[in-house]
């Protein structure tokens, strides 16, 4: 686990792919629990350590995850996310050239709880959640394209 920023209120951690942020049905140890142990050891804290999850990244995704170190910080960060005052930007590396240099994609997501997966469809489905994203190609190599992705 790599901590990339820390102050009295929050801590930012570089999440690797295959790690989970919060506990799930798999029983794998989540990053939030690993962080509690790290903080407890680093600061020699007796008793419980507070770590508040402000947002998540899916298991196959790597990136920076922000955690709150106090309940007050968690409340404030949650409010900032709710009001859209925090901007999350994703970068994706893809092999196939996107159809357009920049575009907006609209899909409908259906969650399969038994498989612990979500599926994307081009057309509306019952019980589906509408998902909109905007992407822009920002770099390319001989074989890959780097996209900047913003979820709407």
Residues covered by each model-derived region:
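RNA pseudouridine synthases
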Residues: 1-152
């Amino acid at each position: 686990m790599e901590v990339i920023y820390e102050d009295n209120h929050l801590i930012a951690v570089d999440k690797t792919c295959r790690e989970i942020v919060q506990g799930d049905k798999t029983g794998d140890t989540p990053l939030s629990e690993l962080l509690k142990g790290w903080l407890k050891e680093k600061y020699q804290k007796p008793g419980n350590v507070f770590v508040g999850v402000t947002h998540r990244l899916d298991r196959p995704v790597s990136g920076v995850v922000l955690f709150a170190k106090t309940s007050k910080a968690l409340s404030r960060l949650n409010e900032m996310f709710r009001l859209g005052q925090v901007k999350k930007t994703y970068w994706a590396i893809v092999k196939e050239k996107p159809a357009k240099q920049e575009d907006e994609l609209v899909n409908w997501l259906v969650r399969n709880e038994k498989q612990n997966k979500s599926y994307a469809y081009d057309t509306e489905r019952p019980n589906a959640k509408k998902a909109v994203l905007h992407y822009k190609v920002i770099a390319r190599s001989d074989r890959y394209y780097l996209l900047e992705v913003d979820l709407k």
